[in-house]
Amino acid sequence: MATASPAADGGRGRPWEGGLVSWPPAPPLTLPWTWMGPSWGQHPGHWGFPALTDPSASPAASLGIFEVRRVLDASGCSMLAPLQTGAARFSSYLLSRARKVLGSHLLSPCGVPELCSISTRKLAAHGFGAAMAAMVPFPPQRYHYFLVLDFEATCDKPQIHPQEIIEFPILKLNGRTMEIESTFHMYVQPVVHPQLTPFCTELTGIIQAMVDGQPSLQQVLERVDEWMAKEGLLDPNVKSIFVTCGDWDLKVMLPGQCHYLGLPVADYFKQWINLKKAYSFAMGCWPKNGLLDMNKGLSLQHIGRPHSGIDDCKNIANIMKTLAYRGFIFKQTSKPF
């Protein structure tokens, strides 16, 4: 797996290929919102304001984010001024003012770049104002919505055949804000092996009472279609794509069970993003242990119970949000059926 590199593309990633990108582009910035996320720095892991970084600067000569703010405020250079005069030029404004005010103080990656990694909620909490907190801290994605999906299915040791979906969760993730806007979540009654095995219950946390009397897969698929229509996801002008942790859910499990039951597979299930591949493009390593490795690699806390479909979806969404904040542009990884 390869990552986008500054040298390979003139210092900028290519959003249509998926990878880390340098943002914003050269001024003037024409988008209606301001991206304060990553730009290529002078060493791996450096996010934002590379021009403020001098690799020869000693730690003693470095100023942290709050020291920078204090010095700027004391000099009458409000860090909110760019919001009133053109937020798109925020970084260049801060660069010029910081250089004038701070003089010989050189800023290290633990200084001003910290401004870029702080969340918009924290910006508001630290007094940077609601206007800054409201800015969207992500580069534009190729899709309006990401549909995060993670099935749980009947299982045992040795494996039973055919496996049947017993939990069907979907999170609708806004591609601009990377926030969850809607949730579809249903349990499914298995019909070939209606009795869950102890192994299955221990692995997934799903007990027999949670699937007894629930709709069949055919009925659940009909409700998924109704939900998709209600959420505006079937509009041809709305671009959406499913996201899974691996290819199993939509390449193996759903088409396999639908084939067994003689059910059609909707076209929207035939393209997806494999988060493992996206993560490997962004981070340069393959997550052998799936969500656990991805959360660890991004210093994220695992949400909920492993192998709970809905909790796994929340973890996927959180990982996607973190990668997007770092400048990753998601693209389809599945091949056409």
Curated annotation (Swiss-Prot):
Query: Does Transferase count among this protein's keywords?
Result: no
Domain named Exonuclease: residues: 146-320
Which parts of the sequence bind Mg(2+) 2?
Answer: 150, 249
| Top-level EC class | hydrolase
> What remark does the entry make about the cofactor?
Binds 2 magnesium ions per subunit.
Cellular component annotations (GO), alphabetically ordered: plasma membrane
Q: Which cofactor does it need?
A: Mg(2+)
Any one Gene Ontology MF annotation carried by this entry is: nucleic acid binding
Q: Which UniProt keywords apply?
A: Exonuclease, Hydrolase, Magnesium, Metal-binding, Nuclease
E.C. numbers: 3.1.-.-
First and last residue of the signal peptide = none
User: How does this protein assemble?
Assistant: Interacts with PRNP.
Query: What name does the UniProt record give this protein?
Result: ERI1 exoribonuclease 3
